[in-house]
């Protein structure tokens, strides 16, 4: 879930500091955009409404206090293949979802959608099974594949609920972790 992109953003924040630039300097943002839309997102962090291809911060949203459970199969999805499949048969996000999300001021008001999910799920048939299983778990809401996969997540009202679901998922042989949402962004942490 953004591992390489968040690492790239962290390196850029460190370089900006070494160069005497603010992390939100437009030159740093330009480099981030050249590396990928989600790299630019990690410079902002938190919950936000983004424009363009995901690199332009429109506004920040109040972060949800709900917990999250992440579930992944043993295999991964090739991001390039998922985008190739998507490009062959693109699926726009429904208009009503976009209208709702544009009006949102809190992350809890956003209708979650991932129009890349069908392409990724076609490449790894286990993903729909995980999504369906997660949707059946008590307390899970807004079950969705993250980006091109292979992590599927569900929002859960409590950390205890997310932990319970994660434990049940590992019994199925999947990697799973409970976590929470954060308003943090990539930052330089001083050494000891």
Where are the predicted features?
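Conserved, helical-rich catalytic subdomain that frames metal- and/or nucleotide-binding sites
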Residues: 44-142, 157-163, 167, 177-192
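Short, well-structured alpha-helical segments that form the helix of a local strand-helix-strand
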Residues: 24-34, 163-166
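Active-site phosphate/pyrophosphate- and oxyanion-stabilizing loops and adjacent acidic/basic residues
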Residues: 13, 29-30, 132, 167
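Short glycine/serine/threonine-biased micro-segments
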Residues: 1-2, 34, 43, 50-52, ...
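N-terminal pre-core extensions flanking Radical SAM catalytic domains
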Residues: 146-157
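DPxDG-like acidic metal-binding loop motif
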Residues: 1-25
